[in-house]
Amino acid sequence: MPEIRQLSEGIFEVTKDKKQLSTLNLDPGKVVYGEKLISVEGDEYRTWDPRRSKLGAMVLKKFDIPLKRNSKVLYLGAASGTTVSHVSDIVSEGAVYSVEFAPRSMRDFIGLASRRKNIFPILADAGKPDSYAHIVEPVDVIFQDVAQPNQAEIAARNAVRFLKKDGYLLLSIKARSIDTAASPKEIFKEEVKKLEQAFEPGFEVLTARELMPYHEDHLGVMARLKK
């Protein structure tokens, strides 16, 4: 019998031969990206590969993930939905507003969204939040995984527009999308400084950790707007 350990609300460690990060499948019997399904006492868990998910890596790097069953989430950089599907599992009674700029990725993503009533796909540029302001309500959490040079600016624009006063920003900073020559550590230091000082009202950075060994040259950041 597999062993289940809850790491935080909606996030589990399932041990069957080995420990595997998992979420409770909101769409039983269906897989999204080739993950394993594990049944335990009538519940079905989907394994969550941290090497294919920045948020999954942040869980294993001991971030205090603030997602709840009824959370409203704005996900920037949805791609084809690998991580969005796990967020959908976690916020089973909430909503995941999922922004993706690439039409090809969105075509793949639409199939996933059609099976999960809490996913709302939005084909848009995450750098232009006003273009989807008529769709997105105030959210509890913003998760951002976009490979653009102005990652901090995009996060700030969306947080000011949509994040509740007591909400949280979870951000994956990809150093090589900002500067291919500079030291990743220097890039991370500068991007955190931008979050804290370059935008009004600015962010209070709560946690910042590199996502190795799961993702090279990536920094995970958890922050909230300054009060």
From Swiss-Prot:
The name this protein goes by in its record: Fibrillarin-like rRNA/tRNA 2'-O-methyltransferase
Gene behind the chain: flpA
Record's subunit section: Interacts with nop5. Component of box C/D small ribonucleoprotein (sRNP) particles that contain rpl7ae, FlpA and nop5, plus a guide RNA.
Entry superkingdom: Archaea
GO biological process: box C/D sno(s)RNA 3'-end processing; tRNA processing
UniProt organism field: Methanosarcina mazei (strain ATCC BAA-159 / DSM 3647 / Goe1 / Go1 / JCM 11833 / OCM 88)
Role: Involved in pre-rRNA and tRNA processing. Utilizes the methyl donor S-adenosyl-L-methionine to catalyze the site-specific 2'-hydroxyl methylation of ribose moieties in rRNA and tRNA. Site specificity is provided by a guide RNA that base pairs with the substrate. Methylation occurs at a characteristic distance from the sequence involved in base pairing with the guide RNA.
Residues involved in S-adenosyl-L-methionine binding: T82, T83, E100, F101, D125, A126, D145, V146, A147, Q148
Pfam families, per database record: Fibrillarin
EC code(s) of this entry: 2.1.1.-
